[in-house]
Amino acid sequence: MKKFKSFLSPLIQAYVDYQKASERWDETSYGSNLILFDRYCQKQYPIATALSQEIADNWCRKRKTENNNSCRSRIYVVVSFIRYLRKRRKTDIREPEIPRKERRSYIPHAFTEAELKNFFYACDNLLNEPLSRVPRYRRITIPVFFRLLYSSGIRTNEARLLRVEDVDLNQGILDIRYSKGHAQHYVVLHNSMLDIMKEYDAVIRKQYLARTYFFPARGDAFHTRKWVQTNFRQMWDKYNSAYATAYELRHHYATENINRWTDEGFGFDAKLLYLSKSMGHSILESTRYYYSLVPGLAGILKDLTGGTFNEIIPEVDDEESN
């Protein structure tokens, strides 16, 4: 059955194919909203032959039931599609304005040592589950995948999209090519994590002889965001009661590193810059988000850096945050 049905269907499909080839497509986030836009065009503009400013603006206009963030989520892929068309001179309409991201009061879960021990115990004990219930590739992938998030602070999508060629097992370096904002950066693995990655690679390559992704899914594809969410939830809920998400392992990595700064020799500027770069923040100010997660740290830093604190770490609008 044809997925897209409006007059824009050939262009939409070309856009989706391009995004997939560029490995910047997330079916969960973008697919449903693009289909809704296509159906809107089919129903409201049945005789249209070209995308107009009216069509784009009417769809992207913020609805009464939406806040800025929900509107952003709905229209982002459509604005990206229009940008794609403009670059190829297939339309001359302007890009609709995307509402500014609103601050959220969300506070990431603060993991306890016991919770993390429970979580990784559940991951490791997949090996004891019957093969009929847990495929072999899943039981060996899950413990390594989530330990990588925990030990390196990389984003979940960065781990999902890691190619075999992006992982230097000799030097212990990850080349993060596809990321939030598409900013390339490098991450140095802890020696213990490097050993785990080497063991995993030796085992998984026997099952996937010529895999593209370091953590392969069926059909030589990468794992979906839903795969991460589902498996984290299943492992977490086995022995823990508080709510947590896989992405919060990144928050934990940042705050644990920052907490150590008050106990070690300070070297504030160098440590801040290193943490910012290793976490893939394109601007230094984005790292400031994590200071609000470490009780009392902002005051400590201000005392140690004096008047330069606000110059080094100014207020940010949380556009990049995490």
Give the positions of each predicted feature.
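Conserved catalytic core of the tyrosine transesterase superfamily
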Residues: 1-322
